[in-house]
């Protein structure tokens, strides 16, 4: 695919992104499967406005730096025809001083399980939701006068296998949903399920906002869990932590001036705090 074709695909997205009114940046940034004009592979798009160069490297190119093209507005992109689903990759950020830092893709849909830290090639596959009955019920429900009894769950510690393994989404569906029903709850509130390397953070030190934690399963398996919960007439609530990310794993290019980091100990279990 030519530079002009990439620019045509991304230009409008980039315009709205840089004007602060793109409501679904995950639809163009990150890794997306393409099949157009005889080209089949994955398109990688990275926002790194201060980088001198940006590279993609992974299983598909023997972990050699593959340069991306600067499209416009700080977005770098390229097509990797040899990339396949489930392969690992990282992003190389060249600061222009001879130093390249290797980062995860902050818009990745899947990641390796910690302590490994590569992003995994993954697409947004078509999925059949089965929650239409539940959705229709919400329009007729009087929320003010309906029962409300919320059960908050930390998926990693709610139950564990004897060998210490966490329950997967499929196992949570088989055990958590019946338990909530038996105990008379109306809502299930899941503490953050987005990708995070440290269980002890309760999911609040997030590295991948667009991926579920691989210790529980895949994005598709999470959707199955939601289908089963809504099929049992439960409302799901998902806690999202947007104030305690781990930017030193994802920051693209030179550190923006509005992000300050400190190495002082924090009460959240980390050795570095972040403020904007």
What are these regions (language model features)?
Residues 58, 80, 93, 192, ...:
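Glycine-rich, histidine-containing beta strand-loop boundary motifs that form or position
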Residues 47, 69-70:
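Well-ordered beta-strand positions
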Residues 47-54, 61-63, 83:
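Short proline/glycine-enriched turn/loop motifs at strand-loop junctions of beta-rich domains
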Residues 43-45:
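A short beta-strand segment in extracellular, disulfide-stabilized domains
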């Amino acid at each position: 695919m030519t530079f002009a074709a990439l620019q045509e695909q991304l230009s409008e997205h980039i315009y709205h992104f840089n004007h602060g009114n793109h409501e679904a940046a995950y639809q163009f940034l990150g890794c997306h499967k393409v099949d157009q004009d005889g080209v089949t592979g994955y398109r990688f798009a990275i926002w790194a406005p201060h980088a001198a160069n940006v590279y993609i490297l992974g299983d598909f190119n023997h972990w050699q730096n593959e340069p991306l093209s600067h499209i416009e507005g700080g977005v770098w992109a390229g097509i990797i025809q040899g990339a396949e689903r489930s392969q690992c990759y990282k992003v190389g950020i060249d600061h222009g001083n001879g130093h390249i830092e290797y980062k995860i893709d902050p818009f990745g849909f899947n990641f390796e399980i910690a302590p490994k830290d590569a992003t995994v090639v993954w697409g947004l596959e078509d999925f059949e939701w089965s929650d239409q009955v539940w959705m229709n019920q919400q329009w007729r429900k009087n929320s003010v006068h309906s029962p409300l009894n919320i059960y908050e769950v930390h998926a990693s510690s709610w139950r564990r296998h004897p060998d210490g393994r966490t329950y997967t989404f499929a196992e949570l569906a088989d055990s958590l949903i019946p338990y909530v029903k038996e105990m008379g709850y109306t809502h299930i509130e899941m503490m953050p399920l987005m990708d995070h390397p440290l269980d002890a953070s309760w999911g609040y030190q997030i590295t991948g906002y667009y991926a579920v934690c691989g210790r529980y399963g895949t994005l598709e398996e999470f959707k199955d869990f939601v289908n089963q919960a809504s099929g049992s007439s439960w409302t799901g609530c998902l806690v999202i932590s947007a104030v305690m990310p781990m930017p030193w794993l994802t920051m693209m290019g030179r550190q923006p001036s509005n992000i300050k980091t400190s190495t002082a100990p924090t009460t959240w279990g980390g050795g570095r705090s972040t403020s904007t």
